[in-house]
Amino acid sequence: MKAHYWFILFLWVAVRMEAGGKMAVSPSATEMLLRFQSHDVELASSWVKQREDLNTAFLKSLEPDRLLHNFRVNAGLPSVAKPLEGWESPGVGLRGHFVGHYLSAVSALVERYEDAGLARNLEKVVEGMYACQQAHGNGYLSAFPETDIEVLETRFTGVWAPYYTLHKIMQGLLDVYLRTGNEKAYALSLIHI
């Protein structure tokens, strides 16, 4: 509860009311927020740190080839990896969106902790996605067929949410670029549909 009071105090100091009821952020608060980096924060032993450790262990357990399976199959490339299950199962309309979340989460961990193992896995996934985009030959990149977009726009049935999935993939790639400086991830985020 004490942390909530500090947060409220911070907001009270950082935001002030100007004449006419407009909100304005003080320059010093803005500068402080702009200087804020994820590695400047250390989580104390708590349920939050336990959850971060649990999620980090899960992300480390994921093999890049399994994450790339549906992308490769969709691009006509061979894959001998065991497909992921659940939302990423082959044939599921949202396949690919979890990989976007993976990219966002792992890039945040790499930025924060400079974990070499996670950085290598992230690089492998980006390189694998690049190979898939090249195999498509038209700039397209996803774990579902490009025709799903046409089906959605013309028949309105039979597909789930291709634009949502593309957004997750693009956001993940942008996060990789912004957090790690990976130029290839940025180029990949410019998906052509």
Label for each model-derived stretch:
Residues 40, 46-50, 102-116, 168-182:
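Well-ordered alpha-helical scaffold segments within catalytic/enzyme domains
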Residues 148-160:
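Aromatic/His-enriched, Gly/Pro-containing loop or helix-boundary segments
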Residues 191-193:
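Conserved small/polar residues in nucleotide/adenosyl-binding loops
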Residues 10-18:
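Hydrophobic h-region of N-terminal signal peptides that target proteins for export
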Residues 39, 90-104, 117-120, 160-168, ...:
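Aromatic- and histidine-enriched alpha-helix N-cap/loop-to-helix transition segments
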Residues 2-9:
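Sec-dependent signal peptide recognition
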Residues 136, 140, 164, 177-184:
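Mature catalytic domains of secreted/periplasmic carbohydrate-active enzymes
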Residues 20-98, 119-146:
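Low-complexity, Ser/Thr/Pro/Gly-enriched N-terminal "stalk/linker" regions
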